[in-house]
Amino acid sequence: MILHRCFAWNRSARADAVDGPLWFPQMYQGEGRHDNPDEYGCLYLADRAVSCVVEQLAAFRGQRLSSSILRRRGLPLALAAIELDDKASLVDLDDPATLGRERLRPSAVATRDRRVTQPQALGLYRRHPSAAGLRWWSSWEALWANVTIFDRAARLLRVGAIDELTLDHPVVIEAADVFGLRLTT
């Protein structure tokens, strides 16, 4: 399965090193939907490129799209294609049968309240020790699937193409359109 990650990229970093496409930034985690940094690190990926870029641009709704929005910590944002081994299993939170088995409600999965989603993720991580991660729908577009990959699945990941994001990148334009972000001239 090919997934996508939008991340701050250091071109000279190894894939699994700090600011590489397969780096699990556990030391900086704690605010994200499924973060539990005392137990695991995770990567936030998506089934389509636009979904992960939308996640990066969401904080800038109502602003003009400028090149500074495409930088984090002085590094350019990049889009990486990441292959998850076909043998990997995901806990699919978009599957009604899974929600029933796990005694989860869709509203609790979709909430932005981290006091709800982080304990859910920790429980799933512990109950499914062979799961590579979690799959759920994007809060920006329900047809987009987001995937949280746990660090225990790092060996199941391979990096494909990496593109530095620019204002004229087609995926940036598509993602900016979701929020009505307009290019500064």
Task: Label each region the model flagged.
Residues R33-R64:
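Extended catalytic/binding region for NAD+/ADP-ribose chemistry, centered on the ART fold
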Residues M1-G32, Q63-T185:
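Active-site and NAD+-binding cores of ADP-ribose-processing enzymes
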